[in-house]
């Protein structure tokens, strides 16, 4: 499974034996080539990205449009940065999404990004106000890989950092979210600190070699002890038995029907 939160949920609330579960998240290289990434001054604007058919993404777009972005834009105008824009990317934008586009408000619904990494690297801050959802969030992985600090929620960081400091900020209410977004857009030293924390998460929590070796070790153990593992899995045996029984009775029904 790619999410340690879901593993804990299955064990704690559904009593799934730990030996039936294995944690292997998205994998990342150990080191990001920071020198190849645009620095703070070379970046501009905010970015939000995600498939419009995914309900948590659509909900976050609506929250940005109707509450968060107007507040962010107003605060940036006060500090002399009224030119900041929010660019929203995602596949399958329906008419109700494209109708939200308003260049005068700095709210740009751009639809599909031909190069998601390029647009993420060009942005200064990633906004991901997810109010529900689960699993690893690809947009936040991409943001860390591109050196773009992200402002998200407790749902957003779920299964994303292993307790390490987040590479950006975590806020569940509108005012705290807006304050964090403005601060990260405005203060270069804060931005650099959070960028490095994102790199640390990739290095220490999603490192490819560590998880790959663990997966290889587990598969080898299963291969060498397959009968024992299957014998210890009572529920699995029961489900397998009844699955075979269903095909048995289906076969008998077909035979009777064809007589």
Feature map (PLM): residue ranges:
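Conserved catalytic-core segment of nucleotide-activated headgroup transferases in glycan assembly
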Residues: 12-16, 21-117, 121-122
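Short acidic/histidine- and often glycine-rich active-site loop of Leloir-type glycosyltransferases
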Residues: 154-170
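Conserved acidic donor-binding segment of nucleotide-sugar-dependent glycosyltransferases
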Residues: 167-175, 183-188
């Amino acid at each position: 499974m790619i999410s340690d939160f879901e593993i804990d949920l299955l064990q704690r609330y559904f009593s799934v034996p730990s030996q039936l579960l294995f944690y292997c998240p998205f994998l990342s290289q150990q080191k990001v080539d920071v020198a190849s990434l645009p620095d703070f001054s070379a970046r501009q604007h905010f970015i939000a990205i995600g498939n419009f058919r995914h309900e948590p993404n659509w909900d976050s777009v609506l929250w940005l449009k109707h509450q968060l972005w107007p507040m962010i834009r107003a605060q940036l105008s006060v500090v002399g940065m009224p030119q900041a824009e929010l660019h929203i990317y995602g596949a399958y934008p329906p008419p109700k999404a494209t109708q939200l586009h308003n260049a005068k408000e700095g709210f740009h619904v751009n639809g599909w990004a031909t190069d998601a990494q390029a647009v993420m690297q060009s942005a200064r801050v990633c906004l991901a106000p997810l109010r529900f959802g689960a699993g690893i969030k690809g947009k936040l992985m991409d943001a860390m890989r591109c050196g773009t600090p992200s402002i998200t929620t407790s749902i957003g960081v779920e299964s994303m950092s292993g307790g390490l400091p987040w590479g950006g900020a975590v806020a569940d209410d509108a005012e705290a979210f807006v304050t964090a977004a403005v601060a990260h857009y405005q203060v270069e030293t804060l931005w650099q600190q959070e960028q490095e924390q994102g790199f640390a998460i990739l290095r220490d929590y999603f490192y490819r070699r560590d998880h790959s070796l663990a997966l290889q070790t587990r598969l080898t153990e299963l291969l060498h002890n397959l009968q024992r593992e299957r014998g210890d899995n009572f529920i699995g045996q029961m489900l397998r038995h009844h699955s075979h029984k269903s095909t048995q009775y289906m076969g008998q029904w077909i035979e009777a029907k064809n007589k």
